[in-house]
Amino acid sequence: MPTGDFDSKPSWADQVEEEGEDDKCVTSELLKGIPLATGDTSLEPELLPGAPLPPPKEVINGNIKTVTEYRIDEDGKKFKIVRTFRIETRKASKAVARRKNWKKFGNSEFDPPGPNVATTTVSDDVSMTFITSKEDLNCQEEEDPMNKLKGQKIVSCRICKGDHWTTRCPYKDTLGPMQKELAEQLGLSTGEKEKLPGELEPVQATQNKTGKYVPPSLRDGASRRGESMQPNRRADDNATIRVTNLSEDTRETDLQELFRPFGSISRIYLAKDKTTGQSKGFAFISFHRREDAARAIAGVSGFGYDHLILNVEWAKPSTN
């Protein structure tokens, strides 16, 4: 028959709780008197609650600078920031060193030494390499064969002999009918129409291939007399015409292209304003033959050019 006195064994859960309490007691006993990893278990006076924040500190030891700052986070807790810098000494020119000692002004008046990101932009360093003339000659680039073709005249207009296509000639509507009418009057064939009388043939300057010195008496044209000494210089006045009602934008080249189909031109004089350099509205054209000048008067007088009607007549001979 069971009695009230019996040995009750502790349960497994009770044994676990007792072992945990014993472990906590042992751990707390072992940690007493053992310093932390920092060497000091107490808070610094600057980090105590209620103490004011000290100013930043800078300690320079050789080429190592240590900056210590104290701040307060969002939760109101104080914390310390320690930054370590390595000081490097760089050599600079006198002008750069002098500029660094200038007093700051404006928004950077109270900034510490050094650039401020808000007001200063530090660009990348640009390295320059200086070479001598000998190295420059050795590094010359190869000549482009296309550059040689730039100076050559590949396309030639049949009307004004310009460097453009005939269909795009700006004088197609003015000089074209005049050349056609002149060719019909002279009775030229189709092949000869391209070379009307008076057109200037391209003259290429003869170059001395040997490179030797040639005296003036043996050069080309040495046997010819000067223009002022020619006896037929007076005849130019008889083959000179006067053109009026020209626009202000007219140039000698325009007159050359306009009157060249009628014959060989000896000289052109365009009256210009000394201040503006624009045309005064009249010009003198001298031909080598009087017949060419007569054809020019008949062909151009009353002709519309640059929105104006040209008036061409014989020029009065000079009294000199």
Swiss-Prot record:
What is the recorded post-translational modification? Phosphorylated. Phosphorylation is enhanced upon serum stimulation.
Instruction: Tell me which InterPro entries the record gives.
Output: eIF3_g, eIF3g_N, eIF3G_RRM, Nucleotide-bd_a/b_plait_sf, RBD_domain_sf, RRM_dom
Q: Might you name a Gene Ontology BP term for this protein?
A: translational initiation
Report the residue ranges that make up the RRM domain in this protein.
239-317
**Annotated GO MF terms:** RNA binding; translation initiation factor activity
Question: Taking the first listed entry, what is the main subcellular location of this protein, grouped into a coarse class?
Answer: cytoplasm
Question: Per the record, which residues fall in region Disordered?
Answer: 1-25, 209-234
Originating gene: EIF3G
The protein's location, in the record's own words, is:
Cytoplasm; Nucleus; Cytoplasm, Perinuclear region
Protein name (record): Eukaryotic translation initiation factor 3 subunit G
The record, for SUPFAM superfamilies, names:
RNA-binding domain, RBD (SSF54928)
Q: What is the lineage of its organism?
A: Eukaryota, Metazoa, Chordata, Craniata, Vertebrata
Q: Where is the composition biased (Basic and acidic residues)?
A: 221-234
List modified residues, type Phosphoserine.
S8, S11, S42, S189, S223, S264
TM helices/strands, residue ranges = none
Where does the record place the modification Phosphothreonine? T38, T41
Family the entry assigns: Belongs to the eIF-3 subunit G family.
